[in-house]
Amino acid sequence: MRALWVLGLCCVLLTFGSARADDEVDVDGTVEEDLGKSREGSRTDDEVVQREEEAIQLDGLNASQIRELREKSEKFAFQAEVNRMMKLIINSLYKNKEIFLRELISNASDALDKIRLISLTDEQALSGNEELTVKIKCDKEKNLLHVTDTGVGMTREELVKNLGTIAKSGTSEFLNKMTEAQEDGQSTSELIGQFGVGFYSAFLVADKVIVTSKHNNDTQHIWESDSNEFSVIADPRGNTLGRGTTITLVLKEEASDYLELDTIKNLVKKYSQFINFPIYVWSSKTETVEEPAEEEEAAKEEKEEADDEAAVEEEEEEKKPKTKKVEKTVWDWELMNDIKPIWQRPSKEVEEDEYKAFYKSFSKESDDPMAYIHFTAEGEVTFKSILFVPTSAPRGLFDEYGSKKSDYIKLYVRRVFITDDFHDMMPKYLNFVKGVVDSDDLPLNVSRETLQQHKLLKVIRKKLVRKTLDMIKKIADEKYNDTFWKEFGTNIKLGVIEDHSNRTRLAKLLRFQSSHHPTDITSLDQYVERMKEKQDKIYFMAGASRKEAESSPFVERLLKKGYEVIYLTEPVDEYCIQALPEFDGKRFQNVAKEGVKFDESEKTKESREATEKEFEPLLNWMKDKALKDKIEKAVVSQRLTESPCALVASQYGWSGNMERIMKAQAYQTGKDISTNYYASQKKTFEINPRHPLIRDMLRRIKEDEDDKTVMDLAVVLFETATLRSGYLLPDTKAYGDRIERMLRLSLNIDPDAKVEEEPEEEPEDTTEDTEQDEEEEMDAGTDEEEQEQEPEKKSTAEKDEL
């Protein structure tokens, strides 16, 4: 009986289990679940696609609802231009995939701008959702990235029109309506945008894009596309957004990095940290919180307290619940753009400390800026900007000068970072200037290459240069001379050479050493103020160092007469001055070239002419005989006082300093026609008629023009003048031989006397040493043989004894 009862109970349980299993299959079972993962390969391609689509779920919709939704949605084909645009974007236009997030946030900002402007005239515009924010959420499990804004949203018609056709962003049409409605004609350039183009960049990282949008004048709709076609349908969940748009990206496998919180945060800070509206990212952090203690721990603590505090137990009216501290991972919205763009505020409202803090944050520098300027430019293009001059020159400032792009100027369009990858935002010589430019008139173009050619960018560049030069000009003289010029003086000189339109402004910023002060530098304005009466030229002398320049024979008479001479000691200096035709109406005169003349009285003029006539025989002898192939002409000098002679370049020839620089160029091959032309030009040989060497030469050639000693002396004087004038000798050995010959004559040594020959050393007798070595080797060999024979002798002796 008992066995029957147990058997019946088992049957009932089996029946119940079978019925329950049937119920579960009927409710939630699918073919895929029944087959299991082990039969994945038996599915058809259509089944796999269907299952992948069902895995893409929106909040509040399960797989079957999503499938039903797709079946009922209205299908559309993209406009032909849209297909071409998407292919262009995906294949080539966007070189950097990460900008998709910048574009989506920019679109969200435009939508928020719209609703905020509408709310100024419509109090009910924000009733659906008073928040004006952008929120970004990553869903690693479902491979989804959500970007949600509470902007104006889109109606069904706008979803089809704006996302299915190109150049129909909705924003431009919106601006037209607002312009017509405004009576005062106030500009609404804040709202300019190109939603239709930037939106398609989402397909750079997404296989599928789902847009859920709610407009105040329509119900909530869902737009979905895989880049081939799109569909639109009313959202069966109803109004879940209140107002605004959520863009959901089903990321490609290779784009999974964009589901990492650190990646998203860095992109937001890089491109969108100055957007006008708060941007939040759904992120986690670890917090220490208090939780109720477990019952056993609480009971134990209560017992201990009861033993220790039995005396006061009656006085406690209520007992607090026992808790403990634990670490938990808490998820919340984290604000990413807490730094507000100070360039959008009036400069009068920004404190100096704020500029310094912004500069350090923006440039990643630890030092304060040397100078800054905050301005708003208006006219053909309107933009706001803050520019900074760093305290010290960036490392490698002139490495690859001209070919390396400057990335110190960051371009924003409506607070959206566009790029810092520019070659032409600032001229090359201002490549040390750092700053931001924010324009509302530039388009949010999809290509920085296209933007680079935009005509408004050239206008911006022109204004940036002018403002930068104004900023530099306002740096205090002491700070300018001691700090700025040491760090960036070469840049200003290069600017004089390269920037024709701003050459006059840049010339006022130049600083040079001069004979006026042994250490201080001077400006050209200060030089002109100190010029002597009737002085019509600015005199300068170029050399490898100040010592070389101020000891040059070319400056002797100028310094003696009290004229100030500018010393050019940097390789770029002479190029810089050559690029300046004049300064303040005064032309520049290189004192190492022809053209140096002094104001002279009639008496002085007569004396000079008499001297020239006196030395005419020597001058002709030098030109036609002694130095026939070496000089263009020989003249009596007006610039020499101590030196016997000097070699002077023509007005369009190379000075000694310039020739040395040109021949030292790394790319110099000797085949350049212009270089060879300048280098081969003959020069003028100037003599000092008051020098004893010159006067004695005049006496000697009058006695004998063919005197070999005088001929040698003339050549040595020429070669010495070549060196003292800064030029290089083509044959230094011949120069050395002539100097030696002159020294022999001065010491009464026969010029043809030969150098004494060294006595030949007798070779060392190595025969005895060799024989001795051979004997030692033979003895050593004999010893070795004897040592080898000893064991044999011992063995024989032992045998004999036996």
Curated annotation (Swiss-Prot):
Annotated motif Prevents secretion from ER, positions: 799-802
Indicate where the modification N6-acetyllysine is found in the sequence: K479
On modification after translation, the UniProt record reads: Phosphorylated by CK2. N-glycosylated cotranslationally at Asn-217 by STT3A-containing OST-A complex: this glycosylation is constitutive. In response to various stress, 5 additional facultative sites (Asn-62, Asn-107, Asn-445, Asn-481 and Asn-502) can be glycosylated post-translationally by STT3B-containing OST-B complex, leading to a hyperglycosylated form that is degraded by the ER-associated degradation (ERAD) pathway. In normal conditions, the OST-A complex together with CCDC134 prevent glycosylation at facultative sites during protein folding, thereby preventing hyperglycosylation.
- The entry annotates sugar attachment on N62, N107, N217, N445, N481, N502
InterPro entries on file: HATPase_C_sf, Heat_shock_protein_90_CS, HSP90_C, Hsp90_fam, Hsp90_N, Ribosomal_Su5_D2-typ_SF
Q: Where is the composition biased (Acidic residues)?
A: 289-317, 757-789
Query: Which keywords does UniProt give here?
Result: Acetylation, ATP-binding, Calcium, Chaperone, Disulfide bond, Endoplasmic reticulum, Glycoprotein, Hydrolase, Hydroxylation, Nucleotide-binding, Phosphoprotein, Sarcoplasmic reticulum, Signal
**EC number(s) recorded for this UniProt protein:** 3.6.4.-
Q: Binding of ATP: at which residues?
A: N107, D149, N162, F199
According to the UniProt record, list the residues that bear Phosphothreonine. Answer: T782
> rRNA processing among the record's keywords?
no
Alphabetical list of SMART domains matching this protein: HATPase_c (SM00387)
Q: Please give the residue positions where the record annotates the modification Phosphoserine.
A: S64, S172, S403, S447
Q: Which residues form the signal peptide?
A: 1-21
Give the enzyme class: hydrolase
Q: Name one Pfam family in it.
A: HATPase_c_3
In the record, which positions carry N6-succinyllysine?
K404, K633
Keyword Transmembrane recorded: no
**Site Important for ATP hydrolysis: which residues?**
R448
Q: Which NCBIfam families does the UniProt record give?
A: PRK05218.1
Family of the protein in this entry:
Belongs to the heat shock protein 90 family.
User: Protein name, please?
Assistant: Endoplasmin
